[in-house]
Amino acid sequence: MTSERSRIPCLSAAAAEGTGKKQQEGRAMATLDRKVPSPEAFLGKPWSSWIDAAKLHCSDNVDLEEAGKEGGKSREVMRLNKEDMHLFGHYPAHDDFYLVVCSACNQVVKPQVFQSHCERRHGSMCRPSPSPVSPASNPRTSLVQVKTKACLSGHHSASSTSKPFKTPKDNLLTSSSKQHTVFPAKGSRDKPCVPVPVVSLEKIPNLVKADGANVKMNSTTTTAVSASSTSSSAVSTPPLIKPVLMSKSVPPSPEKILNGKGILPTTIDKKHQNGTKNSNKPYRRLSEREFDPNKHCGVLDPETKKPCTRSLTCKTHSLSHRRAVPGRKKQFDLLLAEHKAKSREKEVKDKEHLLTSTREILPSQSGPAQDSLLGSSGSSGPEPKVASPAKSRPPNSVLPRPSSANSISSSTSSNHSGHTPEPPLPPVGGDLASRLSSDEGEMDGADESEKLDCQFSTHHPRPLAFCSFGSRLMGRGYYVFDRRWDRFRFALNSMVEKHLNSQMWKKIPPAADSPLPSPAAHITTPVPASVLQPFSNPSAVYLPSAPISSRLTSSYIMTSAMLSNAAFVTSPDPSALMSHTTAFPHVAATLSIMDSTFKAPSAVSPIPAVIPSPSHKPSKTKTSKSSKVKDLSTRSDESPSNKKRKPQSSTSSSSSSSSSSLQTSLSSPLSGPHKKNCVLNASSALNSYQAAPPYNSLSVHNSNNGVSPLSAKLEPSGRTSLPGGPADIVRQVGAVGGSSDSCPLSVPSLALHAGDLSLASHNAVSSLPLSFDKSEGKKRKNSSSSSKACKITKMPGMNSVHKKNPPSLLAPVPDPVNSTSSRQVGKNSSLALSQSSPSSISSPGHSRQNTNRTGRIRTLP
C-alpha cells in the first residue's frame, strides 16, 4: 500500500505538467480528479496536446483505490468500502484471488473469509485459519496456510484483461451474501496451478442451504413482524395473513434441500449472526448424501459421473431421462406421485401450523380491522369457524385472500357493490394443484417456495379501499364517470343479445351447389350464355310422365318470366310438385291441357321459379303507372273470347294426337328473330342475383304438335308489388300467344312473398311428364306471313337487327316428329303489352308470334 500511495505525487506532478500549458489553474485542478483530462481544458489548442496529456495519464498506472474515486458520479462500477478490502482485494476484477473449498460443507469461499465461514457455519468443528493477509502483499503465505485446512480449488492469474467469473452476477452477490456466493472457479489460463476439483453448478446449489433453511416459527411475534416488513402495506392487518400463509418452511429432508437455486438471501445470515444456530447435521448430510434411486433424480452427471441427488421433481433433467434411471422399486411416475402426495401433506401441516400461530397473534388486531371493514363496506360479521384443516380460516376471514388459483376475484369491486365479497378459500394445496398440469415442470411453484425462505405473496398488494373518483365499475378495469352513454350501451347490449338469441343464421337456407354458373350480370347485360342450357346438356332432368287433368292457371307459367337474370328455382323433387288443382278467381283465361296416355316421349322442363331479391336496382326504363296495369287486366279479360275461335278449330284437326304435355321454358326476347326455347337443368339451388331480367315471355309448348307460346311481358314498374298475389300478376300475362318483342325488358324485382314464389306454386307444371328426345330438335321455320298478324317464327338472320345476343347462347327447341300442321293463334289473342310501356320495347313493329303447333288446347271460360 505504501508503494501504491507513493505514486500519487507522481500522478499529480504529471497532471500538473500536462495542464501547465493551460492558463487557468482551476481547470488544471479539475484534471487531478480525472483519469483522462477533459477536452474542455484544451479549448483552442490542437488535439495533439490533449492526446499527449491523455497518454501521459494512461501510461502512469493509476492507483486502484483512486480509480474508484475518479469515475465521479458517472461511474458504472459499484464501489466497495475500504473496510472490505481484505475480502475483495483492491480491484476484484483484476486482482489475484484464491478459492478454497471447505472440507466440512464443500462450500467454495475465499481464503479471506474462510475464518469467518468456519466460525459461523461450523463453530468449533474446524480450527480456524489465521487471519489472512491481503492477497496483493503476500498471496503465497495465505495460500499455504489455507491449504492445511481446506483443499485448494483454484487460482486465477492476475491479468488485467481476463475476467475470473463467467457470471458477473456472482461478483455483485458477494457484497450481500458473502458466504453463500457460488464461484464457478476455472483453472487459470496462463499458469497451471494445483489440480483443481471441478465445482459444478449443479452441485453447488445443494450446498447452499443453511441449517436455518428449515425455519420453524420460534416466536410467532417475530414472524408477524417479518411479514409486516415484507408486505409493506398501509393497512397492516389484512395483508399480513397471505404472506404468512405463503411463506413455506423448508424441512431439512434431503429431498427438499436438494433442488435449490444457488443463492440464499441474507435473512438467514442475520439469524446466524444473531446466534440462532442449529445442529450441524444438515451439512453432514449434504456432504455424505447417498444416492437413493427411489427418492432422487438419479440421472448421471456428465462431469462428475455421479447420479443426480436432487429430488424426483428435478428440474435440471428431463422427464424421459428420469424415467430411464434403473434400480427403482416402482415406476418413476408412481414414485413421483407418492413424493408429491407427501409434500402436499407436509404443506398442509405447515399451513395449519401457520394458521394457528397467526390466530394467536392477530386476535387483538383483527378486532379493529373488522370494525373498520364493517363500517366501510357494510358486510356481514366475520365467521371465525374451523370446519376442516383444509378450510380453516383466520378470524378475519372477511378479507379476500385469493391464492393464485382464484386470483381473479379481486376486492376492488367492493367499493362499488357496497359489500366486501368473501371469496371461498381454496383447499390448502390449491396452489400446487393448479400447477400440476405440465409434464416437465410439475412442482414448479412448490419447489420455488421451498427454495425461498423469505416471506412473499403471490399477488400485488390489494388495498381495502381506494378512491374511485365517482366512477362506476362497468367491467374488468372499465370505469365510467358519467351516464351519457348508458341508454346507448343498454340498447346496443339488448340488440346484440336479441341477435344472438334469435339465431338468425339458422334461418338462412344453405346455398346448395347449382349446375348453373352464376353470372354476376350488370343491369344492361343481355342474356348470359350460362342461363340457357342446350338440350344436349347431359345434366338435363328426365322425369317420368304422370297424367294430370288439372286446370293450369297462367300464374304457373308467368312467375319466372321477367323477375331476375339468373335466379331460377328448379326443384328436382317430384313429390314436392304435386299440386293438381289451382285456380285463382282473378284469372280470366285458364288453360286446361288434357293429358292422355301418349307413347312418344315428351319434353317438359320444370318451371324455373324466380326469387326476387329485394335489393334489385330499379330498371332504366320508365316506370309505368297504375293505369297501365289496369289496362293490362282489361286486355287479359278480352283474351279468352279471342281464344275460343282458333284453338278450338285446331283441336278438331289434331284430336288424334290427344296426349299433350306442357313444356315450359324461357324464350328470351333478346334472341330476336330466331326465338329458341331451352330446358333448364333441374338444379336444387335458390340462387338470386341482382341483374336485369331479360326473360319476359314464357312459351307453353305442347310436345305433340309444337309450340303454343304463352309469351307475355310484364310491364316494368318501380316495385310492382301486386296486392292479389300471383293471381293479379297473371292479369299482366297473355294466356295464349303473347307478343315476343325483341327488345330487352329490364324489369325490377317483383316484390312477391316468398310463399307465392315457393316451389309449391310450380307444382302442377313440374309434375307433368318430362322426357325429351334429342333427335327431334329442329328449328322452327316461318310458316305464315306477317300480314295476317299470325305467329311468325323469327329467322336467325334477323338477329342483326338487335345484335344483343349471339345465336349460340340459346338452345334449339325440340320439335316432335308428329307435329305436321301448324296452328295459328289469332292476332287478337296475343296480349300486346307494347303499348303499355313504350320505353320497354325497342321496335313495336316486331311484335310477332311464334308458330304454334298446338295439340289439343281447350279454352275454358
UniProtKB/Swiss-Prot annotation:
Transmembrane spans: none
Chain positions covered by the region annotation Disordered: 1-31, 154-189, 342-448, 606-673, 772-861
Residues annotated as domain SCA7: 284-351
Biased composition (Basic residues): 617-627
Compositional bias segments (type: Low complexity): 372-381, 403-417, 606-616, 648-671, 783-794, 829-847
Sequence ranges of Polar residues compositional bias: 355-369, 817-828
UniProt signal peptide: none
Biased composition (Basic and acidic residues): 342-354, 628-641
Superkingdom per UniProt: Eukaryota
UniProt cross-references to InterPro entries, sorted A to Z: Ataxin-7-like_regulator, SCA7_dom
Protein name in the entry: Ataxin-7-like protein 1
Organism: Homo sapiens (Human)
Organism phylogeny: Eukaryota, Metazoa, Chordata, Craniata, Vertebrata
Protein encoded by which gene: ATXN7L1
